[in-house]
Every structure is written in structure tokens, then in C-alpha cells.
Amino acid sequence: MTLVNYLVLSGLLFTIGAATVLVRRNAIIMFMGVELMLNASNLAFVAFGRLHGTLTGEVVAFFVMVVAAAEVVVGLAIIVSIYRARRSVSVDELSLLKN
């Protein structure tokens, strides 16, 4: 595959993730959309790194994965605590964090 193919795939994955975040109201599904966008950016970083023949893209993608893992831990903990309090993870019904 060429660089253009990887970038088109990355753009497609990012678009699907962004559409998921914008359209869905379930916090878990929105969370998966954000993770899809992060993985799409990782694919672009690695593709550009391979184009230039350096490990910079892989290193950046690794750090993005580390930050994404921390995001998953914190995000799922927040979603679970909201579910325990409200018995729903719908974003429309949440006013728990207001005020």
C-alpha cells in the first residue's frame, strides 16, 4: 500500500469516529468514537514515519496509545460512577456535573 492509501484509510476512520461522537448520545459509544479517532491519527503518524524512514511516527503513536490508555481508565471510571448514580449513560440525561 502507498502513503495515500494509508492516509485515506486514516481519514475514513477519523471521519467515522467523529460522526459517531457527533451523532450518538450514549457515552460509551461516544467514547469508542474518540478511541477510533485516536487510532486513525496513530495510523497517519506511522504512515508518515515510514515515508520519512524514521521512528518518529511510531514513537508518537506509542505515546498517543499511552495517553489513550490513561484516558480509558479515567473515562470508564467516570462512566461507571455516573451509571451507578443515574442508571443511565445517555449524555442527554446527564446534569450530574453541572454547578
UniProtKB/Swiss-Prot annotation:
<feature type="transmembrane region" description="Helical">
    <location>
        <begin position="59"/>
        <end position="79"/>
    </location>
</feature>
<keyword id="KW-0472">Membrane</keyword>
<comment type="similarity">
    <text>Belongs to the complex I subunit 4L family.</text>
</comment>
<keyword id="KW-0874">Quinone</keyword>
<dbReference type="InterPro" id="IPR039428">
    <property type="entry name" value="NUOK/Mnh_C1-like"/>
</dbReference>
<keyword id="KW-1003">Cell membrane</keyword>
<feature type="transmembrane region" description="Helical">
    <location>
        <begin position="3"/>
        <end position="23"/>
    </location>
</feature>
<dbReference type="GO" id="GO:0048038">
    <property type="term" value="F:quinone binding"/>
</dbReference>
<dbReference type="InterPro" id="IPR001133">
    <property type="entry name" value="NADH_UbQ_OxRdtase_chain4L/K"/>
</dbReference>
<comment type="subunit">
    <text>NDH-1 is composed of 14 different subunits. Subunits NuoA, H, J, K, L, M, N constitute the membrane sector of the complex.</text>
</comment>
<keyword id="KW-1278">Translocase</keyword>
<keyword id="KW-0812">Transmembrane</keyword>
<comment type="function">
    <text>NDH-1 shuttles electrons from NADH, via FMN and iron-sulfur (Fe-S) centers, to quinones in the respiratory chain. The immediate electron acceptor for the enzyme in this species is believed to be a menaquinone. Couples the redox reaction to proton translocation (for every two electrons transferred, four hydrogen ions are translocated across the cytoplasmic membrane), and thus conserves the redox energy in a proton gradient.</text>
</comment>
<keyword id="KW-1133">Transmembrane helix</keyword>
<feature type="transmembrane region" description="Helical">
    <location>
        <begin position="28"/>
        <end position="48"/>
    </location>
</feature>
<dbReference type="GO" id="GO:0050136">
    <property type="term" value="F:NADH:ubiquinone reductase (non-electrogenic) activity"/>
</dbReference>
<dbReference type="GO" id="GO:0005886">
    <property type="term" value="C:plasma membrane"/>
</dbReference>
<dbReference type="Pfam" id="PF00420">
    <property type="entry name" value="Oxidored_q2"/>
</dbReference>
<dbReference type="GO" id="GO:0042773">
    <property type="term" value="P:ATP synthesis coupled electron transport"/>
</dbReference>
<keyword id="KW-0520">NAD</keyword>
<protein>
    <recommendedName>
        <fullName>NADH-quinone oxidoreductase subunit K</fullName>
        <ecNumber>7.1.1.-</ecNumber>
    </recommendedName>
</protein>
<dbReference type="GO" id="GO:0030964">
    <property type="term" value="C:NADH dehydrogenase complex"/>
</dbReference>
<keyword id="KW-0813">Transport</keyword>
